[in-house]
Each structure stands twice: as structure tokens, then as C-alpha cells.
């Protein structure tokens, strides 16, 4: 474009006239301007000059917007966490730059039982330093299992077997727990 623009200047008249300019190289592709002076020399009169400016507009600044940090509850399936994580990754956006491209250092979703993954997104552009932003995807830790065992139990002798069986069953069922993900209680009592 610059070369073609330089060649648009013309002149007429003069004796043995010739035209030159101080155009040199074009301004930077990422933005800038250059004032060029053309000079016509002729053997019959003083030099005649004119000037014009060639401008390349500045590249639009890169604007990078990361997704907000996101927290997911524990005890979901790993597939559900992976799906939520992958959707979250797509919530990044950017604009501006020249020949801009975006990448990230994603290493995968955190475990469904709890953890966090920090992702850094980077936009590279021909006309400015890399722009980066970070966000964190967290899965809350699964609640700790708290097991309360049955208390020792002593039964009097000479009861019927069905009474002992009923007391034993009730005693086995007196063990309780809280927490965990999809937790279940079992015992070796038979």
C-alpha cells in the first residue's frame, strides 16, 4: 500500500525535471505515520516540493475477559464435573489485537471428590505483548465421614432366641455416620 501511495504523486513541466522523495520504508504495520516530501528539481527554476502523510491506524488493544471463578459441590459424578469444567472453559472472551489467538494451560478438571484447577489464558497478538488472565475452578471437598459405632451391649441370659436376635439387630443398626459422597454403611455382624 505504501509503495503504491508513493507512486501516486506526479508532476508536469520543468526542464530536464526529475522527482524524488524521502519516503524510505513504510510506517510500522501496527500503527504509525510518516510524512513524505517529494521534490522536483528542474534546471530552469528552484526546486518545487510537496508533502503528504501516510498513516497506519493503531491496532486495537487486546481486551481479555476470563470466566469468573466457579465452585461446584462435591459428590457429583466425575462426568458431571468434567462437563461443568469444559463449559466454564468456553466462557473466556477477547477482542482486539492483530492476528490475535487465544490459548490456555488447561490440565483437566479437578477430582469430583474435591480440588481446584487454575487456568491461565493467553492472547498473543502481532502488535502488543501477550495478555493473560487466570481463573479457578473448584470442587468443594467431600464432607469427612464421621462414624459413630454402636455402644457395647450386654444382654441378660435366658431370653428367647428371637428376643436376642431382635436386640442384636437393633444394636447393629444403632451405628450411624455422616458425611462422605454416596456413602453406605456395612458391618461384619452377619
Language-model features: where?
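Proline-threonine-serine-rich low-complexity tracts
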Residues: 1-190
Amino acid at each position: 500500500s505504501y509503495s503504491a501511495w508513493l507512486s501516486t504523486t506526479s508532476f508536469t513541466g520543468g526542464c530536464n525535471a526529475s522527482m524524488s522523495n524521502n519516503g524510505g520504508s513504510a510506517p510500522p504495520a501496527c500503527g504509525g505515520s510518516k510524512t513524505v516530501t517529494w521534490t522536483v528539481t528542474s534546471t530552469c527554476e528552484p526546486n518545487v516540493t510537496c508533502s503528504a502523510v501516510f498513516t497506519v491506524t493503531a491496532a486495537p488493544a487486546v481486551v481479555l475477559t476470563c470466566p469468573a471463578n466457579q465452585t461446584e459441590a462435591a459428590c457429583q459424578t466425575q462426568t458431571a464435573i468434567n462437563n461443568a469444567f469444559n463449559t466454564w472453559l468456553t466462557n473466556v472472551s477477547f477482542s482486539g489485537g492483530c492476528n490475535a489467538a487465544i490459548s490456555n494451560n488447561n490440565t483437566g478438571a479437578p477430582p469430583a471428590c474435591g480440588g481446584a484447577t487454575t487456568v491461565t489464558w493467553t492472547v498473543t497478538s502481532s502488535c502488543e505483548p501477550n495478555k493473560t488472565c487466570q481463573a479457578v475452578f473448584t470442587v468443594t471437598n467431600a464432607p469427612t465421614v464421621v462414624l459413630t459405632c454402636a455402644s457395647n451391649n450386654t444382654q441378660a441370659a435366658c431370653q428367647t432366641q428371637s428376643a436376642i436376635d431382635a436386640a442384636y439387630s437393633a444394636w447393629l443398626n444403632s451405628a450411624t455416620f455422616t458425611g462422605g459422597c454416596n456413602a453406605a454403611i456395612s458391618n461384619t455382624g452377619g
